[in-house]
Amino acid sequence: MAHWVKGNPVDISNGVHVVEFWATWCPPCRTSIPHLTQIQQQYKDRGVNIIGISNEDLGTVEPFVTRMGSKMNYTVAIDEGRSTSKGYMGKYGVNGIPHAFVVKDGAVVWHGHPMAKLEAAIDDALK
């Protein structure tokens, strides 16, 4: 990651994490932000981290995250050069955003729209 805009760097090689690709200009992405904040709150005591990743520049993402405040209460990072995005989205043939990946111990165990069955996928990964 080029920049960790909100929160500390996360090591996804251990535990359960949600890696979600989004953009400030994307209305469905903005709609899913409060839902992801709710999920982060719901699962934080079980060690789950939500990581929102954008490939936009710091000058675009940072003010957006600041304006969102507590409505966007999870880790946010910038993927300059799209290497992380290509590693996830490209591998699974996904082009559209928002798109979330549930990662358990470094391996993707589910992927889909963050508003569709994400909680069930997290619950399964935590078993």
Locate the predicted segments by residue.
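Active-site-proximal beta-strand/loop segments in catalytic clefts of secreted hydrolases
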Residues: 21-23, 53-56, 79-81, 112-114
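Thiol/disulfide oxidoreductase modules built on the thioredoxin-like
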Residues: 68-72, 79-125
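Structural microenvironment flanking redox-active thiols in thiol-disulfide oxidoreductases
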Residues: 31-70, 81-89
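Short pre-active-site segment immediately N-terminal to redox-active cysteine/selenocysteine motifs
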Residues: 14-17, 22-25, 57, 96
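C-type cytochrome heme c attachment motif
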Residues: 24-31, 99
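Hydrophobic beta-strand anchors of alpha/beta hydrolase catalytic cores
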Residues: 18-19, 50, 100
